[in-house]
Amino acid sequence: MSRENQVRQSLFDIERALRESPFWQVVPPEEEAFNSTEPFSLDTMKPEEWLQWVFLPRMHALLDSELALPRSWFYCLILKKRWKGRQKRPRRFCCVSSSSMSYSPPMYRMAQCTMLEIIYQDEHLVAVNKPSGWLVHRSWLDRKEKVVVMQTVRDQIGQHVYTVHRLDRPTSGVLLLALSSEVARALSQQFESHQMQKTYHAVVRGYVLDDGVIDYALTEELDKIADKFTNPDKAPQPAVTHYRSLAQAEMPVAIGRYPTARYSLMELKPQTGRKHQLRRHMSHIHHPIIGDTAHGDLRHNRGMESHFSCGRLMLHASELQLNHPVSGQPLTLQARWDAPWQGVVTQFGWKGILPEFEGVEFPADSGQDSEHFVEQ
């Protein structure tokens, strides 16, 4: 067995042992934790967190890059007692420099062996329940990303897929993909002409007691790298979001200067499709979405993770209504909440309010279709 294969096998052994231990985490640390300059991120992470979210992904990415391995590095083989048939004392970890590779936290390496939940599939299109933390597809900024929805779906169904729309990386829920370029164009036209109705659910800070419409124009959010040649002086674009308050909860935990924390479960229906529209609109009315690191409340984000074991963005694309691009029949596609979402719903006393989204979790390697759609 080559040295590379030995290293890879040892990495899988470490990952399997970690999964079987009580230290395995489904929710990654806060994004700020990955900015540590200390060895092993000792000032921001626990050792088991660093092992799962930094060491293992970087090692896998380094192996996948097919670069020559330095002979002086034994990597995870230092955790084994045998090397080339000889007894060895366990040695210390050798930290992999971030300069040797590209790594964007959080990297869900475990997802590479997980099949996505298929909501709907026929000979023309497929819809999946996109997990939080997954990219829809690679771009030149993250071309080395190993876990992307399009590649996973392609491998899962054995057929090329085409993008129709996108969900932000931290957002979960219904993602529609076409199985031909013609169908992709037809579906894209439906999106552009606002013929599809999208419904999101979100958990926001504070009590929202009424329903309403947010009609607030948004300037374009530019990426410092990807949009560096884009005109920054574009006029604000119209943006409209309809919202409905579904439930409220007051939890006995002190966050900031308040002795309790208040939250609301919201239904959001965007009439337009501006970048980060729902996040920016909810922040505009002073009820930011929990887990939003760009427009949200950092104290509540941390409080949600520390008190309720949920560190993800609490925004889920729950439902998509459209006309089938070939048959013309109405389709309603629904995506269920993941385990962190379900945990918050249960702890906040909201269970049963939206039972259609409270489905049981699939086994990680089942690949079973959910058939969670309504054909009208």
UniProtKB/Swiss-Prot annotation:
Homology family: In the C-terminal section; belongs to the pseudouridine synthase RluA family.
Name this polypeptide is given: tRNA pseudouridine synthase C
Gene3D superfamilies noted in UniProt: Pseudouridine synthase, YqcC-like
Species for this entry: Pectobacterium carotovorum subsp. carotovorum (Erwinia carotovora subsp. carotovora)
Catalyzed chemical reaction(s): uridine(65) in tRNA = pseudouridine(65) in tRNA
GO BP, one annotated term: enzyme-directed rRNA pseudouridine synthesis
Role played: Responsible for synthesis of pseudouridine from uracil-65 in transfer RNAs.
CDD domains per the UniProt record, alphabetical: PseudoU_synth_TruC
Active site annotation, chain numbering: 168
Catalytic activity, EC: 5.4.99.26
One protein family per Pfam: DUF446
Keywords per UniProt: Isomerase, tRNA processing
One MF term in the entry's GO annotations: tRNA pseudouridine(65) synthase activity
Gene giving rise to this polypeptide: truC
